[in-house]
């Protein structure tokens, strides 16, 4: 089987493509971290170094070279002390704090896409902490909105030999698929202990699973029998790969499934995300339009209130006219409120001096003629 192409080969074929983000989930003890370690070494050996992110704040040591480590940003034990939390609460709070800066992580991934074709993301051991938390949803949706994102559910094959336990694992995988709505791959880990062929047979052959259930006589087995009918549709479209994280077997087949899942993302999931983005942008545009219309209505009512009384020949002023002519209106108000309204400002001082001078000359001539008589 063909190995994943190196970053240089992808550049030669027409420029770098967005890296595929592999979001590794699984129950505690299923071997997620060991799987990521083996996956990292495999990709390095193929000349395709991945970009690795550790999202487990409670891990003591990371057995792989992490490009981004949540422990460098959030101190798990300090969070527990400061907020008085237990182990799970500390992990959730640490993830919440880290999610507030995930936009910076997205920028780092964008910068690294020239050199890395894959982004490996190791999640906390307690699967529900990431899967059902707000921060887990934020991180998953942020990745899926920009890059091909594939959920890899790591399952402990050695602990799933019991049909009831197997069904519990499948139900959890189904719930994650339903919540994330992303391409999904079930990695049946620890095939070095027991081969995963029995699980594949149970998924493909309903009667074989029923025969295994007939050995169980509990109420749970009856419930499992009913659920197996419901999950038939789920099994038909599920990608399953048997892997040994210890020996490194099954990784070639895994990357064949990853390539198929990436194509599925580009074909089905990306158009859906683009449609959701356009729908959100349209809703925001409609909201802004409605706010503008309400503002225009409010401004129109102000314009009506500033109009003159009925019967007046003066035009009604628009609010913008009030702003532009504010200085003129103030001057008119000052003239109307002046204390010298009773003075005729058209009569100048010069017009008063001429008749007063004529009266003075007439009085002087009269006195002169009176003396000479």
Curated annotation (Swiss-Prot):
Disordered: region residues: 304-373
Subunit structure comment from the entry: Heterodimer with GPN3. Binds to RNA polymerase II (RNAPII). Interacts directly with RNAPII subunits RPB4 and RPB7 and the CTD of RPB1. Interacts with XPA.
GO molecular function annotation: ATP hydrolysis activity; GTP binding; GTPase activity
Biased composition regions of type Acidic residues, renumbered to the chain: 330-342
Full protein name: GPN-loop GTPase 1
Keywords: Acetylation, Cytoplasm, GTP-binding, Hydrolase, Nucleotide-binding, Nucleus, Phosphoprotein
Alphabetized CDD domains for the sequence: GPN1
Family: Belongs to the GPN-loop GTPase family.
UniProt modified residues of type Phosphothreonine: 328, 340
Ligand binding (GTP): 29-34, 189-192
Function (record text): Small GTPase required for proper nuclear import of RNA polymerase II (RNAPII). May act at an RNAP assembly step prior to nuclear import. Forms an interface between the RNA polymerase II enzyme and chaperone/scaffolding proteins, suggesting that it is required to connect RNA polymerase II to regulators of protein complex formation. May be involved in nuclear localization of XPA.
Keyword Membrane in annotation: no
Compositionally biased residues, Basic and acidic residues: 343-355
Group of enzyme by EC: hydrolase
Cellular component per GO, a single term: cytoplasm
Cellular localisation: Cytoplasm; Nucleus
Species assigned in the record: Bos taurus (Bovine)
Phosphoserine carried by residues: 301, 312, 314, 338
EC numbers: 3.6.5.-
Name of one Pfam family that matches: ATP_bind_1
Chain's gene name: GPN1
């Amino acid at each position: 089987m063909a190995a994943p192409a190196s970053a240089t080969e992808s550049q030669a074929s027409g420029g770098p493509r967005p890296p595929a983000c592999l979001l590794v989930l699984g129950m505690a003890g299923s071997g997620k971290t060991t799987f990521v370690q083996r996956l990292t070494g495999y990709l390095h050996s193929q000349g395709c170094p991945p970009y690795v992110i550790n999202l487990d704040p409670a891990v003591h040591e990371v057995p792989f070279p992490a490009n981004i480590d949540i422990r460098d940003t959030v101190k798990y034990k300090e969070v527990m002390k400061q907020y008085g939390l237990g182990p799970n609460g500390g992990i959730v709070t640490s993830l919440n704090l880290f999610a507030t800066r995930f936009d910076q992580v997205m920028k780092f991934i964008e910068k690294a896409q020239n050199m890395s074709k894959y982004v490996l993301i190791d999640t906390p051991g307690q699967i529900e902490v990431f899967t059902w938390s707000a921060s887990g949803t934020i991180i998953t949706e942020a990745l899926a909105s920009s890059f091909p994102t594939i959920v890899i559910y790591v399952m402990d094959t050695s602990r799933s030999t019991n049909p009831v336990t197997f069904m519990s694992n499948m139900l959890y995988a189904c719930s994650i698929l339903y919540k994330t709505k992303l391409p999904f791959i079930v990695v049946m880990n620890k095939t070095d202990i027991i081969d995963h062929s029995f699980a594949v047979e149970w998924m493909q052959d309903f009667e074989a699973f029923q025969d295994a259930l007939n050995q169980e006589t509990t109420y749970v087995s009856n419930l499992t029998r009913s659920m197996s009918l419901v999950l038939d549709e789920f099994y038909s479209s599920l990608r399953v790969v048997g892997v040994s994280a210890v020996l490194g077997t099954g990784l070639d087949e895994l990357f064949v499934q990853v390539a198929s899942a990436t194509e599925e993302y580009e074909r089905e999931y990306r158009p859906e995300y683009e449609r959701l983005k356009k729908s959100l942008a349209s809703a925001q545009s409609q909201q802004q339009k409605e706010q503008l219309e309400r503002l225009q209505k409010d401004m129109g009512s102000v314009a009506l209130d500033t109009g003159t009384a009925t019967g007046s020949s003066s035009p009604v002023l628009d609010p913008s006219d009030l702003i532009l002519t504010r200085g003129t209106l103030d001057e008119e108000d000052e003239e109307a409120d002046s204390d010298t309204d009773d003075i005729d400002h058209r009569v100048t001082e010069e017009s008063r001096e001429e008749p007063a001078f004529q009266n003075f000359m007439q009085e002087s001539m009269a006195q002169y003629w009176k003396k000479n008589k």
